């Protein structure tokens, strides 16, 4: 049997893109209304981490969740926002499950993400989460790089929106090497936009990174699901090659996945 020369197969984002941008905002404060409108204007998508059990005077009422967060993701932030590293593990489980149930009852879809409240977590909590139906969890802190995470249960963002946002955004849009996958992940709280200058900074960022053909705009869970689907693909050892120097796309029946061979 004659074997073909090995071919290069890359995991790409939808449409063959090699960059993804995602946002993550906590606590469901009233300022989310303006932030969501800004994201929607520039085609940017993100995840909003809500607490089902906290008083609502300064938070988005449940009656607005479905419409406001349409096109984005709602994820857990625990029911009461405790510092869970100080809590018994069984109580942490109850905090997560109660929040999931509350959010799912309103949103009507499985809620599978978490932002650790107060940035508080332990390895034992991270190990518990998959049994509670949680597929990823965001920690606090910034990497200021664009690498894909090695562990989605301790997912650290590129930057907080007050930490070098435009500088990191400019570096992100200038990335061009398509043999790598790049992710920019911005996190924060909408109540931190206290002045018009703060809002102007975020709009400047959205103008910079929005509407770019090389970038996929995704929620947190979409990235997690996509990478999991890609990892489950099976390939034969001998790949049939296309004509020399011709690029082809092979779509599978997995959501949004494409592979490219050369």
Please place each PLM-identified region on the residue numbering:
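Boundary/entry segment of secreted carbohydrate-active catalytic domains
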Residues: 1-31
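C-terminal domain-boundary segment and adjacent tail
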Residues: 2-13, 41-43, 56, 104, ...
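Hydrophobic "anchor" residues on beta-strands that sit immediately upstream
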Residues: 22-23, 73, 215
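Active-site metal-binding loops of divalent metal-dependent hydrolases
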Residues: 25-28, 78, 190, 220
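Short acidic, S/G/P-rich loop/turn micro-motifs used as interaction or catalytic elements
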Residues: 29, 162, 191-194
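Metal-dependent polysaccharide deacetylase catalytic core of the NodB/CE4 family, i.e.
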Residues: 40-135, 141-159, 182-191
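Non-membrane alpha-helical structural segments and their capping/turn regions in soluble enzymes
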Residues: 89-94, 163-166, 196-199, 203
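A short, acidic, amphipathic alpha-helical segment used as a generic capping/interface helix at domain edges
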Residues: 166-177
């Amino acid at each position: 049997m004659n074997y073909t020369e090995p071919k290069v197969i890359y995991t790409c984002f939808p449409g063959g893109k090699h960059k993804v941008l995602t946002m993550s905002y906590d606590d469901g404060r009233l300022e989310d209304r303006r932030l969501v409108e800004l994201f929607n204007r520039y085609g940017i998508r993100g995840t909003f981490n809500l607490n089902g059990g906290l008083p609502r005077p300064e938070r988005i009422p449940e009656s607005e969740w479905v419409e406001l967060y349409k096109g984005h993701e709602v994820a857990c932030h625990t029911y009461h926002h405790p510092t869970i590293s100080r809590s018994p593990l069984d109580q942490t489980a109850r905090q997560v499950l109660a929040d999931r149930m509350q959010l799912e009852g309103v949103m009507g879809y499985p809620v599978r993400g978490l932002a650790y409240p107060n940035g508080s977590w332990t390895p034992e909590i991270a190990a518990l989460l998959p049994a509670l139906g949680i597929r990823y969890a965001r920690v606090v802190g910034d990497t200021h790089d664009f690498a894909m995470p090695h562990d989605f249960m301790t997912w650290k963002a590129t930057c907080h929106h007050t930490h070098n946002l435009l500088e990191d955004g400019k570096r992100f849009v200038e990335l061009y090497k398509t043999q790598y996958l790049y992710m920019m992940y911005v996190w924060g709280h909408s109540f931190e936009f206290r002045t018009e200058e703060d809002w102007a900074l975020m709009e400047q960022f959205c103008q910079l990174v929005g509407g770019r053909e090389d970038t996929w705009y995704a929620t947190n869970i979409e990235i997690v699901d996509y990478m999991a689907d890609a990892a489950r693909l099976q390939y034969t050892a001998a790949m049939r090659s296309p004509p020399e120097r011709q690029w082809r796309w092979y779509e599978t029946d997995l959501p949004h996945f494409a592979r490219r061979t050369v």
